[in-house]
Amino acid sequence: RTFVKKYSASRQFTGEGYLEYRTTSGNIIDSDKDELRVEFSTVQPSGLLFYARNSGGPFADYVALELVGGRLRFSIRYGRSSHSTENLHETLLGKNLNDAKSHSVEILHDKDVTTIYLDKTSDQEKAEHSFKTKYTKLDIDVAMYVGGAFDFKALLSVKSNALFMGCIFQAEFKKILPGPEKVIDFLKDDKVTTYPRTMNQKCVAQTYEPFTFSSDDSSFVCSVGGLSSANSLSGSFVFRTYKPSGVLLKQVDGGNGFELSYMEMDVQLKVIIRNSETLLNINYQNELTKINKGNWHYVTFNISQTSFELSVGSKRETRTPAVTLPSNFFKDGLTAGGFVGCMNELIINKQKCQPNAGSRIKNVEWSGCNITDFCIFSPCLHGGECTQTGKTFSCGCSGTGYDKGPNSLSVCQFSESESTCESLKKNNPSLSLSDRSYALDFDDSGPIRTYKAFCNFSADPPTTRVESRDFKIKLTPSKQPISQRISYEPSLDAAKALARRSEWCYQFVDFGCKKAKLHTGSNNEKLGFWVSSNGVYQSYWGGAKQGSRSCACGETNPNSCIDSSKKCNCDAGLDKWHNDEGYLNSTTLLPVVEVMFKGVTSGTEANFTVGHLYCAGEISNTATFVNEDGFIKLEKWSPPSNGVISLFFKTPYEKGVLLYNGMPEKDFFQVEIINETSVGLSYNIGNGVRKIELSLGDKQVNDRSWHHVMIYHNMKVFGFRLDNQEGKHENPLFLKRELNLNNELYVAGYPYDVSKGFVGCIRGLDVNGEVQDLSKLAGEAVFVKSGCGAACENNSCKNHAKCLDNYNVYFCDCSKTPYYGYFCHEENGASFKDPGSQLVYEYPSASDVFRFDIVVGFKLGEGKPCIGDIIRLGSSDKSQFYRLSLTNRKLQFDFKGPRGQGSITIDPPSVGDFCRDVHTFALSRRYKVVNYTIDGVKKPKEEIERLDGLFTSMKKVTIGKEGDGGFKGCITGVKVTREAVGQKPETVEPIKEYLYDDKNTDLVTSKHVSRATCGPEPKVPEIPTPRPVGQRADVSTPQGITTNPKLQAEDDDKTAIIVVVVLILVLLLVVLILVIYWYWARHKGEYHTHEDDEELKATDPYIEPAAPRKLKGEEPEKKKEWYI
């Protein structure tokens, strides 16, 4: 491949010169509309193509067009700015533009729109980008440069820092508006100065057939005929690299030979004669760029009896040998390689060396120069140090506070610090924390750096402080409004990030005044404002309610301001110092961004204070997605080269899309619940769909507990976390391309199939370190509610049953009640009124259990004594028992446990006793811990040392008791659960199984027991029917609920057909009515009307064009009405 000469005025740039057009005095560019056209060809990856500058210093107008790492970088700023990055716009276009091919650039600036085109008219890959700018005018009053500049340090926003090396075929700037039109042709205009003046006027052909050494041990042997008998060796080549050091060329045999190598700042030729070394060194210490910045370097060298010579570019060094070369010093073959990089035009003693089949090749690519500058726009985040070889890169994260420890895949993405003092305490319970400063990262992996903030752990919950610098700021009287932005340490963005993730915040404000007014002036003009974090002016002050337009004293009842007719002390305008102070406490509005005062005029004095920002708690920001077609839309996930999204979810369902962004046939990512134990990530970055599936093993993800999900990507990996599981693909973006997403980010939904949506709760959604306000967004979406849980808000669960929120329907958990049915309203009771009533259940085998649960309902029989055993658990060897009975109108739990006997007396939950009405009782014993609930009221747990052990040989459940000691009345819904170590819990329901289900009859013996109802059955509504979302966990499907998605799809199809038919019929009916009405209006009965007037008839849309008009004064014909 070669450079091709296209224009007679082409200019060859050698990397040592540039063109300059001075825009001072009469040549100033003041343009609303202009064009810039540049066409170039090069093999160098970096170099300045065009630059225009203004004299406004670091905040002035400029235009920069440059090659950086083989990509085209375009950067502009119109209008002077108070910040170096304000109004700055930049973009990167194309890749591998240093391919020796011709590339064209066209930039069109038309007022507030600037568009850049790359290779617009060529057959190469095209690209374009547009900016919308705040200002419209380009002002250039210093100079325009092509190919470089005298001093790169004086240029704003230039990344290449290198003179262009290659050919420029066209460089033309055209000012269009305001007129007259002006064209500057940099290659022809006599006002353009060339530095140096000897720069070649035409481009020269250059062979470009590079090869790549892809690893440190890459090499090939270059065979040079006649070299072994030669007295000298001379050679030349060009090379480029990003590796800090390496060997370029060598031939060493014993104590003789030479080696040509490089380091960051040096190229070195070492000649060894009889183990004696002579060094020639070309130093780049004072150059703008280092050797390993990826640019091509031209090297020549010569080794002879009379001299050693080394040249790199225009730098040259010569040495005289101290000893003569031996006769057999050179060999026929020498080795090229020993570094990662590229070579081109390797010539040894006028013979061309290329890697070929006979040259003993090792890891050499022949296809071209295939190295990449990864560090020019550093992929290392948070200030990590980027080092590279041209084939890969690594990030040094030491001292950054991110990605602690050595990790070859790290890009310094994940913070080592907690986000708030609250999370620091919660996630480090073993640490001894005192009131002092700690390293915190308010946006986790976001762009805000780690900062040492003060934590007050004496407060509950702990508070985090971001410091303000604005205390007792004196205000200078002015006729104009006085405004001041509030400064925070480390930044306003950090203060906003803290407030966004906190449950509540407060901030002290104070306005001191002498004659100056704060709130209201004459004619009720508002005088004082503060700007909230969302950019809205607020007119209420510290201590007052949000939106009250008042100060603290104006909020009291009665008004406590100095002048009770005013709302602030300072509005009294007195000639003595007063103040209005207090705390602002709106988390959504804090921190204070700016204050503005109009009431500090001549003859007044004032000062103000905006105190530190204090925040506490962690906002949950929870939303409930009640149907699968409910979702929240956010802006697409960006930037394309790295990002982190994390959230918590809980659901009873085993499917549902949690996150989706992109398009199915293009770049996308999707996080989806796959089944009851697994969640998966699938994505495509342009090289096919890849998947990561993580499983919790025996634990379910649809267990109604919170589970954490995180996805992240960077230039090295795409990763996924589920709770404590993690998977990643080392599928680096830099080997393919960036994650270029279209459309919005969908939370809990999939836009291409709404039936795949997630149903459940999501909280703590964090996108690139920014907490999303799901609670607020839920109010703007359909089928989404703020908070967690929606179905249980109006549930009909009876008898103290727990409502289970399945989010689009609720279920009633009857397991801790002695009732059954969907609403826990049905009884399975038995009568124990007879003196001999008793029911005994014996397990098939005895078991040593650490836990048992008892649930029972009971009602004393009419006129029966308020005593007796209700239920008793016993061991097969009679060594232990546990008994619930009525004694002295109270319940008593007696036991003979592993360490002795004891009892607990249980009072009724309210005034009264257990001798009337229906009562429910639930007890759970786990070793020595006992929990119990009476009539739905949970009592404090008790720890009983005599129970600390196993209930050995549990065998028998006895309900009631034969004889006088038994409970006489109605007992219902007995449920007993036992659990042995290493075994699953086992539940038996003796009354239901024996009397109602006719089950386990061989395990039950009973006397004088029959079915009975202990109390009236409550009225309940119809069973709610949910929309199907898939299989539910832990809950049986109630009768009447459809869960077959195929049936639902068929129903949806039928519904759609019916809707279409109905719409067509309605449309036909409307048309028919219009036709009938038109006919009726045209042919009404006999009557006179002004519509027959000549002027009105001319505008009647229903008059036939051929109908003759009546002459003025002629009696109009009467219309007739026909009855058929």
Curated annotation (Swiss-Prot):
Biased composition (Polar residues): 1034-1046
GO cellular component terms listed in the entry, alphabetical order: membrane
Disulfide bonds: 167-203, 342-369, 375-386, 380-395, 397-412, 761-788, 792-803, 797-812, 814-824
Compartments, record wording: Membrane
InterPro entries reported in the protein's UniProt record: ConA-like_dom_sf, EGF-like_dom, EGF-type_Asp/Asn_hydroxyl_site, Laminin_G, Neurexin-like, Neurexin-related_CASP
UniProt domain Laminin G-like: residue ranges: 8-203, 210-369, 621-788
Stretch forming the signal peptide: none
Pfam families: Laminin_G_2 (PF02210)
Membrane topology note: Single-pass membrane protein
Cytoplasmic side: 1077-1124
Region (Disordered): 1011-1047, 1090-1124
Keyword vocabulary terms for this entry: Disulfide bond, EGF-like domain, Membrane, Repeat, Transmembrane, Transmembrane helix
Residue intervals passing through the bilayer: 1056-1076
Basic and acidic residues compositional bias, start-end: 1111-1124
Claim: Cell cycle is one of the keywords in the record: no
Family matches, as SMART domains: 4.1m, EGF, LamG
Residues in compartment: Extracellular: 1-1055
Tissue-by-tissue expression: Component of the acid-insoluble organic matrix of the aragonitic skeleton (at protein level).
Superkingdom classification of source: Eukaryota
Domain EGF-like, residue spans: 371-413, 789-825
This protein's name: EGF and laminin G domain-containing protein
Lineage, broadest ranks: Eukaryota, Metazoa, Cnidaria, Anthozoa, Hexacorallia
